[in-house]
Amino acid sequence: MNKIMSSYDAISLIKNGDTVAVGGFIGCGHPEELTIKINESFLEKGFPNNLTLVYAAGQGDSKDKGLNRLGVEGLVSKVIGGHWGLAPKLVKLAIENKIQAYNLPQGVISHLYRDIAAGKPGTITHVGLKTFVDPRIDGGKLNDITKEDIVKVIEIDNKEYLFYKAFPINVTLLRASYADEFGNATMEKEAVTLDGLSMAQAAKNSGGIVILQVEKIVANGTLDPRKVKIPGILVDAIVISKPENHMQTYAEQYNPSYNGEIKMALTNIPGLKLDERKIISRRAAMELIPNAITNLGIGVPEGISMVANEEGIGSGLKVTLESGPIGGIPAGGLSFGASINPESILDQ
């Protein structure tokens, strides 16, 4: 079977009404070529339509890229997502009651991929208790037309937990750096690896398919097997992307310090401009504890490690991001999710 095909042929494998899981983290690791072609196909032919979209991190640029390509009335009918803030076109559909919409914790969705892959009935965790995700409050539902309960409260050994129900995934859309002709894929030029393997396994265990976007295709047997992150036995279609649709982040085509190809000199890292965000970051940096493991989130926290580096205390920090990098200096803006000079990069 020839797995290498055009983007249009690949997305023609998606059926109306399918549940589609899409990888990525802001602009890192998002299969932009595929979401562009889904958008174009729907606008030209009305196909595919009525999709259920599932994603963990928020893939988007707050404008038109990423999941915003799918924010068209009729293309999607339901969204189960972690971070919505960078996909305003999906947000608009949810606010206007044009789609069913759920907001679940990002990490829970990552674990759901693993549990769907394992054939489990769902994910059990304390995360979300007594928040808007708790079914006794909103159950993660974002509008009036969203009725189905996909989260419930259970009790184990007299302790309450939330049970997030598993569901079949018909199609998974992923991105890698290189793939061989069979579909074995490596991610050496990606800033993060994210949930790729779990998402692929979740689709295959649901009887679904995996469509992979790559920068280049190489001959079978030429990839280092230790670097293969997604085995070809899980891949159904491979699409070669245009370079502009395979940027390492939405801000940069390629930065070798994000994926460990080089170590950037700290003196070459530009500082933040002096504004209210930098002032807040500087004040927050004063609370940092040397050698403590510190997790930074999106938004204002992005600047904390930059300020720490400017002040000469960055080397004493162990900064982590939920996207996977440990150590280094987290990038900001549309490169958030990547880190400059990371010590290691784990799955999300």
Residue spans for each PLM region:
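Conserved alpha/beta enzyme-core scaffold
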Residues: M1-Q348
